[in-house]
From Swiss-Prot:
Keywords: Carbohydrate metabolism, Metal-binding, NAD, Oxidoreductase. InterPro entries: PdxA_fam. Gene3D superfamilies: Isopropylmalate Dehydrogenase. Binds 1 divalent metal cation per subunit. This is Putative D-threonate 4-phosphate dehydrogenase. Its cofactor is a divalent metal cation. It comes from Cutibacterium acnes (strain DSM 16379 / KPA171202). GO terms for molecular function: metal ion binding; NAD binding; oxidoreductase activity. Coiled coil: none annotated.
Amino acid sequence: MPKTPLLGITEGDPAGIGPEITVQAIHNMADDRSFIPIVYGDPAIISRACSVTGLSETVRRVTSEEHIEPESNVINVVDTGTVPHADSIEWGSVQELAGRAAIASIEAATDAALSGKTDGVVTSPINKEAIWKTGSEFLGHTEMLGSLCGTPDTDTMFVVSGLKIFFATRHMSLREAVDSIRRDLIDHEIHKALRALKVFGCNSPKLAVAALNPHAGEGGHFGTEEIEVLRPAVKSACAEGHNVVGPVPADSVFHKGVIREYDGVLSLYHDQGHIASKTLDFDGTVSVTAGLPILRTSVDHGTAFDIAGQGAASPMTMQSALHVASDFARFVPVIREEYLPSTGRN
């Protein structure tokens, strides 16, 4: 019988809702025997989160991932030693100490997954400004994890309603994103997406490339990127034997993906894919980082400083991230073989 996956959960920015949704998700999923949770962070912060959410869970400081078993009303925490006193962190504001705590949590959880002590990492939201206050220059989780794992060429993959959504560009202005739509980029992103689809269980994946312009450019009347860049890239991938279609108008491509015409969609810029996924299922959208030698899933929302500390945040996205991680844990051997720098094909 396969062993139950041990999933490491980061506490996120302790000034935000990360600790709250973490403890609530663990509480709500206590009867879910498909995974065992372990939190990386500060016990004082996790205890405070239990208090503001009205939970009576015992927060247990542990020093090792060994012999962790599911236990009712107990949250096991590997102490990263950054915030010994919860009142050092003020709810709902950008603080350097909170940034340092978030980084320490990510580093500890990543190290545990890399060494095989856990089967995956599930990340709570962080605040980029707090991270930058520490002197870090990472744009976010994905870049930090890529650096820690030695695999900087990662790919964000949203899992929503059975569809996998990829991004050719992400954290840049819309103007920069449009200027970035070049043949070399699209060729590269198509192959990365196809590779990820195979790693995550699609043996013969069908990928759609979203169009950039209205009506896929309407024969060049509304833009020429489809003619000059996207269509040639799709044609080249097909010539290599891949099942790639497009460019498909963006107002229909995601719907077609949900009804299983495609396994994945390559969106061209941040909001093109985000708007689609969050409209399809706001609480059920889960971010997966493909290209890492570890399994990493994440909630797809921010720290919500405006409601932090009130016990008002919904844990549904964290529960979705845990559910996807427990399901995808079966792919961990393939993930390591494919993406580990010393053995993979990066």
